[in-house]
Amino acid sequence: LSIGVFAFAVWLNRKTNSPLLNPLLVTVAIIMIGLTVFNIPLDSYEKGATLISSMLGPATAVLAFSIYQQRKILQSNFLPIFVGCLVGSTVSMVSAYGLCELFGLGDQVALSTLPKSTTAPIALAVTGELGGTASITMAAVMTTGVMGAIFSPMLANLFHIKNKVAQGVAIGTCSHAVGTAKALEMGKLEGAMSGVAIAVSGLLTCFIVIAATSIM
């Protein structure tokens, strides 16, 4: 069901070429409607999707290969890539926690949304370490990725960001794999740098969380 709906969503996105019809967003919407209309229990759906869920771990390991592939560009642009990922990851976590506190959503929601800009397996590991709620984390990760994929190209044009490395790093840091799919549409270098940024920002997020929790 998930694969079939996603394939349809990808076809629809390519057919319409609309950023609002993001494949992930369309897939989630269709599946939610389908589960509700046909009264399918969420537990049953989750059991059926176990195989897909089990691929999250190997998918994360592939990030190391993307770093290896782009090692020359990473070496020549190490400082701006590292600083960009560090600043982006820090701002993402601080803003998420700050907004949750501002609107009185509580520590549980705040801790669950901290890793929203990292890829799903890393985000789930971080939220598990913090004692957050996995379902909230996944919702935050998905929303962040979709919003990044939709608005990143617009923001790059708005602020006249022409450097392809900068575009890729910004997209990968703030909107992980969902944004990287959009970055690949923009160009090969943007997509590659976005993939590198996912891995680097994911590692930095883990280190920042470990450092913060040890201090607290």
PLM region spans:
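Helical membrane-embedded segments and adjacent short helical loop/helix-boundary regions
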Residues: 1-68, 79-80, 84, 88
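Transmembrane alpha-helix/helix-exit interface in multi-pass inner-membrane proteins
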Residues: 93-110
